[in-house]
Regions:
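Structured, helix-rich domain cores that form ligand/interaction pockets
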Residues: 3-8, 12-19, 62-274
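The alpha-helix within a helix-turn-helix
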Residues: 17, 28, 57
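Short alpha-helical DNA-recognition segment
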Residues: 21-40
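DNA major-groove recognition helix of helix-turn-helix/homeodomain DNA-binding modules
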Residues: 49-65
Length: 274
């Protein structure tokens, strides 16, 4: 009876992991252990330390789809001070350069780029420009899948970048509000009436009024910027459900995310965030 009691948390862990749709590998990487070790824990072949047990429970809790908030990286731009693009692919990205599509043109005045899906790497033989990695929203999600297959996470990747003396040009952190905790029109109203106490001296509020129809909710399509868009740090808060409605035609009541709160960091601010 005591043995069953001791193992009850393992049964609950396995049950919740499966109900959340989380693989052993994904939970193991998030918890800082190997997949075989987690498999042995779930099968009762080994007893984890209290530290490992807590790491597993904390990591699984973050994957709970019923959590009202979750956080992710939504934009990453990093420059590497080298012209050895093959080395960056091999030592930092851990991707096979032969699988990338190569084009003889680039962006940000780079002469060429490599692409796999939405993962973009700009290259130049000019050392002052170096190698530039850009991951937008979809690119971040795609790269996360590669990190998972590599048994790495964002922390491991950023550590490898720092070892290469990389320069963090921009980093966007997004917090998804799944239940409508934030009332963006109300926040915009309070900013306008100077009821918002903040170190930031400016704000901007945009509303996609031309896309609002009579049968839709009032004040939808709001985007609120707090801080100067030219500064190294500012906030962007917008109605994600409305964005998906406009882009994809997803009904508002079927949206997984109601609002999104983004922290946009550039240069030194991005570096210190890492």
């Amino acid at each position: 009876m005591r043995l069953k009691s001791k193992n009850s948390w393992i049964d609950e862990l396995k049950k919740n992991r499966q109900s959340y749709g989380i693989s052993q590998n994904k939970l193991a990487v998030a918890s800082g252990i190997t997949r075989p070790y987690l498999s042995d824990i779930e099968n009762g072949k080994t007893v984890p330390t209290e530290q490992v047990k807590q790491a597993l429970l904390d990591s699984l809790g973050r994957f709970n789809p019923d959590n009202p908030l979750d956080m992710l990286f939504d934009y990453v731009r990093i420059r590497f001070p080298t012209d050895d693009v093959a080395r960056i692919f091999g030592e930092v990205l851990h991707l096979n350069i032969d699988y990338m599509i190569h084009e003889d043109f680039g962006y940000y005045s780079y002469p060429e780029h490599y692409r796999f899906g939405d993962i973009m790497v700009m290259a130049s033989h000019d050392l002052s420009k170096g190698i530039l990695l850009e991951l937008k929203g979809k690119g971040c999600r795609q790269f996360e899948n590669f990190l998972l297959a590599q048994h790495r996470n964002w922390y491991d990747f950023f550590t490898d970048c720092l070892e290469e003396k990389a320069v963090f040009k921009r980093l966007d952190l997004a917090i998804n509000d799944k239940t409508g905790i934030l009332d963006i029109p109300e926040l915009a109203r309070k900013c306008k009436q100077e009821e918002c106490i903040s170190v930031f001296r400016s704000f901007k509020n945009y509303r996609s009024g031309e896309l609002v129809h009579r049968d839709e909710k009032p004040d939808m399509g709001n985007t609120l910027y707090i801080g100067s868009l030219k500064s190294e740090v500012y906030f962007c808060i917008y109605e994600k459900d409305y964005e998906q409605y406009v882009k994809l035609g997803t009904p508002l009541e079927e949206a997984d995310i109601i609002n999104r709160f983004e922290i946009r960091l550039r240069n030194e601010r991005a570096y210190y965030a890492v």
